[in-house]
């Protein structure tokens, strides 16, 4: 111990210089000496750096050896954790390196820290940290008081005063959206209004999770809304979906009503919000799992879905026109059921728009792909023409045929109905690969089974015919969304159904 204390300071300086020269870790995992890892032969593995330190106090010396993960190397070029430090009564010497077991060394000590401070110096040493801690605590209390932390707790009440300068008292979401569709650009609420709404929403409960993040039920001025919260990793998906929802003239009763998009920074992390209408029945997938449907209910679900897709696919020409849009991820989990028993299409994060003037498609730079179970044959075998917009519309039609099959199975006639199942449930595993789906759909040319009982009911017979014409291997032979909508409209009139 005394010999170590006598080691000159130049050696410590050279060690620190060597540490600074080796701060950038290699790509391969490091094996480091770890004095606490008794079960692993005193060895740990990291993608960052090996670390060793010695802390000297007035009465003892503490040695520490371990791994530092790459994520903890802040800033990257000169991490704080690798810098020596000193506090009253203790001195810590550190060394970081990036070679296997390079931290299996004993750092030199610099001698016991001196405590021989004069009265003035001692007062300054004590008062400085105390003042710093007090100021820091006051600052933290102020920040916490003025921010709404939404992830871990739900506030008891909203602060309506925040939106008064922009949105008058008594204004409802329906009023705002009506004003926007009749007198605005038709491309969504102004950004300031969107931000004002988003920042005065009170989250109530989490109602679902997905690959993008979470969905919450929230309240704005007593009205229920759905809040889709994307993690910061999914910024592209959030931006793309918000962009598509704000396409001119997109609003339609059978497409999920978009309200606002905002990025909310709570001081620790950024959350990306997408606010929309709330539908308590949830997705069509959830609805069909819980309930059977009547013939009328089946037709309403199918016709409203076809109406929403027909509006998406349709191009509206004019100064306030709308480009044709293909969904690319249509499935029962991305269709919501409204209170009146009709559907609206949601989750437009993968959608693509067609510019007819230049005949181009704005395919988003997004790593996500559609759901394998609902992929059309030409998508599965990679024969789809990505430059031809009609190809994407035809793939949507194939997927809608599968959704219709899910709905028709739950149609109860005389108390007889099938259990809810996903398409191809009897032919592929629960999470099929593209190869498994390709073998069934493209090679074996199989499609979901249509029960014989459907032939005894006119409505089910029409539904079965539509499905078959949606499932053709040749995409060009499939029905269009508009044709399906017209066929189902005629069926609803025959059945005396009022939509």
Swiss-Prot record:
Signal peptide (UniProt feature, chain positions): 1-29
Extracellular side: 30-122
Post-translational modification: Phosphorylated at basal levels in the absence of ligand. Activated upon phosphorylation by TGFBR2, mainly in the GS domain. Phosphorylation in the GS domain abrogates FKBP1A-binding. N-Glycosylated.
Compartments, record wording: Cell membrane; Cell junction, Tight junction; Membrane raft; Cell surface
GO molecular function terms listed in the Swiss-Prot or TrEMBL record: activin binding; activin receptor activity, type I; ATP binding; metal ion binding; SMAD binding; transforming growth factor beta binding; transforming growth factor beta receptor activity, type I
Keywords, ordered alphabetically: Apoptosis, ATP-binding, Cell junction, Cell membrane, Differentiation, Disulfide bond, Glycoprotein, Growth regulation, Isopeptide bond, Kinase, Magnesium, Manganese, Membrane, Metal-binding, Nucleotide-binding, Phosphoprotein, Receptor, Serine/threonine-protein kinase, Signal, Tight junction, Transferase, Transmembrane, Transmembrane helix, Ubl conjugation
Any single biological process term in GO: apoptotic process
The protein's Enzyme Commission number: 2.7.11.30
Domain of life the protein comes from: Eukaryota
Sites where the protein binds ATP: 207-215, 228
Activity modulation comment: Kept in an inactive conformation by FKBP1A preventing receptor activation in absence of ligand. CD109 is another inhibitor of the receptor.
Transmembrane segments: 123-143
Active site: 329 (proton acceptor)
Enzyme class, spelled out: transferase
Disulfide linkage: 32-50, 34-37, 44-67, 82-96, 97-102
Keyword set includes Nucleotide-binding: yes
PROSITE patterns per the UniProt record, alphabetical: GS, PROTEIN_KINASE_ATP, PROTEIN_KINASE_DOM, PROTEIN_KINASE_ST
Start and end residues of each Protein kinase domain: 201-491
Cytoplasmic side of membrane: 144-499
Modified-residue entries (Phosphoserine), positions: 161, 183, 185, 187
Positions carrying Phosphothreonine: 181-182
Reaction equations catalysed: L-threonyl-[receptor-protein] + ATP = O-phospho-L-threonyl-[receptor-protein] + ADP + H(+); L-seryl-[receptor-protein] + ATP = O-phospho-L-seryl-[receptor-protein] + ADP + H(+)
Cited function: Transmembrane serine/threonine kinase forming with the TGF-beta type II serine/threonine kinase receptor, TGFBR2, the non-promiscuous receptor for the TGF-beta cytokines TGFB1, TGFB2 and TGFB3. Transduces the TGFB1, TGFB2 and TGFB3 signal from the cell surface to the cytoplasm and is thus regulating a plethora of physiological and pathological processes including cell cycle arrest in epithelial and hematopoietic cells, control of mesenchymal cell proliferation and differentiation, wound healing, extracellular matrix production, immunosuppression and carcinogenesis.
Similarity-based family: Belongs to the protein kinase superfamily. TKL Ser/Thr protein kinase family. TGFB receptor subfamily.
Subunit structure: Homodimer; in the endoplasmic reticulum but also at the cell membrane. Heterohexamer; TGFB1, TGFB2 and TGFB3 homodimeric ligands assemble a functional receptor composed of two TGFBR1 and TGFBR2 heterodimers to form a ligand-receptor heterohexamer. The respective affinity of TGBRB1 and TGFBR2 for the ligands may modulate the kinetics of assembly of the receptor and may explain the different biological activities of TGFB1, TGFB2 and TGFB3.
Protein name (Swiss-Prot/TrEMBL): TGF-beta receptor type-1
Natural source organism: Bos taurus
Gene this chain is encoded by: TGFBR1
């Amino acid at each position: 111990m005394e010999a170590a204390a006598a080691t000159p300071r130049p050696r410590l300086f050279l060690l620190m210089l060597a540490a600074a020269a080796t701060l950038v870790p290699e790509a391969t995992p490091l094996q480091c000496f770890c004095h606490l890892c008794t079960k692993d032969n005193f060895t740990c593995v990291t993608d960052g750096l090996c670390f060793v330190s010695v802390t000297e106090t007035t009465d003892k010396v503490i040695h520490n050896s371990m791994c530092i993960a790459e994520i903890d190397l802040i800033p990257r070029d000169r991490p704080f954790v690798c810098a020596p430090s000193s506090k009253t009564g203790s001195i810590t010497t550190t060394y970081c390196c990036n070679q296997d077991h390079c931290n299996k060394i004993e750092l030199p000590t610099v001698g016991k820290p001196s405590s021989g401070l004069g009265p003035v110096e001692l007062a300054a040493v004590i008062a400085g940290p105390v003042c710093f801690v007090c100021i820091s605590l006051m600052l933290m209390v102020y920040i916490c008081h003025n921010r709404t932390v939404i992830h871990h707790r739900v506030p008891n009440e909203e602060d309506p005063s925040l939106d008064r300068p922009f949105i008058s008292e008594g204004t409802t979401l329906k009023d705002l959206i009506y004003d926007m569709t009749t007198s605005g650009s038709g491309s969504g609420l102004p950004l300031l209004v969107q931000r004002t709404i988003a920042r005065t929403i009170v989250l109530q409960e989490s109602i679902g999770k997905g690959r993008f993040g979470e969905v919450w039920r929230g309240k704005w001025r007593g009205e229920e809304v759905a809040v889709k919260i994307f993690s910061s990793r999914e910024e592209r998906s959030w931006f793309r979906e918000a962009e598509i929802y704000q396409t001119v003239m997109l609003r339609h009763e059978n497409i999920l009503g978009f309200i606002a998009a905002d990025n909310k920074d709570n001081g620790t992390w950024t959350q990306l919000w997408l606010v929309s209408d709330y539908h308590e029945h949830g997705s069509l997938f959830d609805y069909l799992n819980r309930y059977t449907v009547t013939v009328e209910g089946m037709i309403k679900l199918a016709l409203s879905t076809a109406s929403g897709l027909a509006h998406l696919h349709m191009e509206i020409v004019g100064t306030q026109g709308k480009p044709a849009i293909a969904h690319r991820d249509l499935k029962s989990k991305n269709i919501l059921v409204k209170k009146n028993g009709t559907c609206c299409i949601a989750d437009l994060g993968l959608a693509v728009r067609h510019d007819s003037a230049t005949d181009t498609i704005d395919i988003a730079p997004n790593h996500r792909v559609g759901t394998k179970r609902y992929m059309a044959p030409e998508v599965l075998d990679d024969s789809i023409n990505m430059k031809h917009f009609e190809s994407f519309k035809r793939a949507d039609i194939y997927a809608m045929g599968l959704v219709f099959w899910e709905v028709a199975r739950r149609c109860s006639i005389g108390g007889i109905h099938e259990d809810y199942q996903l398409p191809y449930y009897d032919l592929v595993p629960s999470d099929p690969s593209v190869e498994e789906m390709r073998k069934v759909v493209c090679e074996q040319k199989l499609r979901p089974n249509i029960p014989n009982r459907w032939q005894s009911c006119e409505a089910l017979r029409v539904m079965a015919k539509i499905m078959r014409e949606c499932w053709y291997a040749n995409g060009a032979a499939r029905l269009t969304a508009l044709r399906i909508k017209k066929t189902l409209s005629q069926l609803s009139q025959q059945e005396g159904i009022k939509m």
